[in-house]
Amino acid sequence: MKAISRRRARECTLQALYSWQVSKNDVKEIERYVVTEQDIQDCNISYFHELYIGVISCAEELDKLMIPHLSRNLEKLGYIEHSVLRIALFELTKCNDIPYKVAINEAIELVKIFGAEKSHKFINGVLDKIANQLCVSTNNHIIK
């Protein structure tokens, strides 16, 4: 599977999660909109679906995992930063085929494109702390 297709799936997931947080529209309607109306060229649609539905279904669990590592209240996080952290944490904890370094680097790249100017430093710090907490194994995967 091409890396670009997963990267594009992460971008589409971020856009869908942002829309979901801001609009509170139906999850399936947002997914349908992204798939039919957005530029999904080079996007791995099945990975987009896995991430989007997975992050939403695990949102509370992912938030609980990040809260102890935030330097501010969860409510003070911007929608982009919050969504990027959720995507990365989903990949760290639920996607065994993704090395933890890839999940963290992809999150940093996403927030550099879509987030505030210095958000990548914040995201990197939070994810690094969480990865260490989750006991990173020697084969670059998180031990569950």
Swiss-Prot record:
Keyword terms of this UniProt record: RNA-binding, Transcription, Transcription antitermination, Transcription regulation
GO MF annotations, alphabetized: RNA binding
SUPFAM superfamilies (alphabetical): NusB-like
CC per GO annotation: cytosol
Pfam families: NusB
Biological processes per GO annotation: DNA-templated transcription termination; transcription antitermination
Domain of life of the organism encoding this protein: Bacteria
Cited InterPro entries: NusB-like_sf, NusB_fam, NusB_RsmB_TIM44
The protein's role, per its UniProt record: Involved in transcription antitermination. Required for transcription of ribosomal RNA (rRNA) genes. Binds specifically to the boxA antiterminator sequence of the ribosomal RNA (rrn) operons.
Similarity-based family: Belongs to the NusB family.
Protein name: Transcription antitermination protein NusB
Native source species: Blochmanniella pennsylvanica (strain BPEN)
